[in-house]
């Protein structure tokens, strides 16, 4: 059977502990790509982080991020598919999370919007791509409705 595409999840599949990719995985991905098979990184993470790891393994195709809510060509503005959550629904989700004491991350292409300063620090460590400025991730901490409205307005098209 000849495959045209291989989709690889990141967390718990491609990435080992400490966010590393084994040499064996890199070698296998290169061999598959050299046979003309598209290698696509797929993840629940935001686009910039997925694209960063896609580069690390040498995948030159599209990236599927945010649990399928974003499909985008790397290093371009070409978005193949994007499904945003309505602004009012985001507000309701944030309000419910705050009332229940739940840490929340809302994603744009390159930004995490969170309701927790602790989560902010953890996310900076987990999603660090500081060695590649093309894939930097911003983190906005939102602690009240006014700030949430400001942030949602900034990212309304993202």
Feature locations, PLM:
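An N-terminal domain-start capping segment
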Residues: 13-21, 127-130
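Short, intrinsically disordered, charge-balanced linker/junction segments flanking boundaries
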Residues: 145-158
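Structured loop/turn residues at beta-strand edges in well-structured enzyme cores
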Residues: 1, 57-59, 157
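Asp-based phosphoryl-transfer active-site loop
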Residues: 2-18, 93
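Short secondary-structure boundary/capping elements
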Residues: 20-24, 143
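Acidic, His- and aromatic-enriched active-site or binding-groove loops in soluble protein domains
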Residues: 121-148
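Active-site phosphate-binding/coordination module
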Residues: 23-129
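Short amphipathic alpha-helical segments
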Residues: 10, 77, 157-158
């Amino acid at each position: 059977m000849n495959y045209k595409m291989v989709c690889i999840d990141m967390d718990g599949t491609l990435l080992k502990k400490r966010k590393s990719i084994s040499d064996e995985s890199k070698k296998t991905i290169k061999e598959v790509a050299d046979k003309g098979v598209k290698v696509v990184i797929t993840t629940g993470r935001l686009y910039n982080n997925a694209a960063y790891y896609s580069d690390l393994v040498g995948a030159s195709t599209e990236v599927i991020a945010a649990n399928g809510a974003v499909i985008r060509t790397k290093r371009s503005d070409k978005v193949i598919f994007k499904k945003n959550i309505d602004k009012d629904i985001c507000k309701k989700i944030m309000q419910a999370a705050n009332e229940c004491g739940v840490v929340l991350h809302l994603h744009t292409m390159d930004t995490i919007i969170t309701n927790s300063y602790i989560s902010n620090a953890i996310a900076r460590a987990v999603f660090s791509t500081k060695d590649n400025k093309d894939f930097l991730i911003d983190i906005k901490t939102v602690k009240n409705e006014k700030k949430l409205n400001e942030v949602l307005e900034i990212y309304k098209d993202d």
